[in-house]
Amino acid sequence: MKHLLILISILLLSSPVIGNSHKGETLYLWETSSGSLWKGFGDKDTQPKYQGQVKDGKPNGLGVIIYTNGSKYVGGWENGKYQGQGTYTKPDGTKYIGSWKIIGGVSSHWNGEYYDEDGIIKYKWVNGKLIKQYKT
C-alpha cells in the first residue's frame, strides 16, 4: 500500500500524463511480422493506446498504456518498455505494484508485489527473483 501511495503522489505531482499542464503524446502499439512498432495513429479497439512522454518515437518517461483486453500499465518507460516504478493492473483487478527492469530487451518484475483482486499480497519479487509466495 505504501508503494501505491508513493506512486500515485509522484504521478499526480509530476506527470504531464495525469497533471493539467500537458497531456503528452499519444502512440499506438502495432504488432507486425517483424516485431512491435510504435505509431502516432491507430485504433484503440485493435491496438494498445499509450499516452505520455515520448522520445525518438517511443514511450520514454512517465506514461499510461491501455491494452485492448482492458489491462493497464501506469508508470515509467524507457525506449518503449516498462522501466522503473509502475503498476500493471489486469481487468480482474489483480495487479503488480513495484519496479521494472529491462533485462535482455524485456521488461521484468524487479522489486514489488503482486496483489489479488481483493488487494491481498500473493507474490513478492526482490532483485528480479520471486522470493515469497503468500498462502491464503
Predicted regions, residues:
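Glycine/tyrosine- and acidic-biased, solvent-exposed loop/turn segments at the edges of beta-strands
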Residues: S14-T136
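Sec-dependent N-terminal signal peptides
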Residues: L4-L13
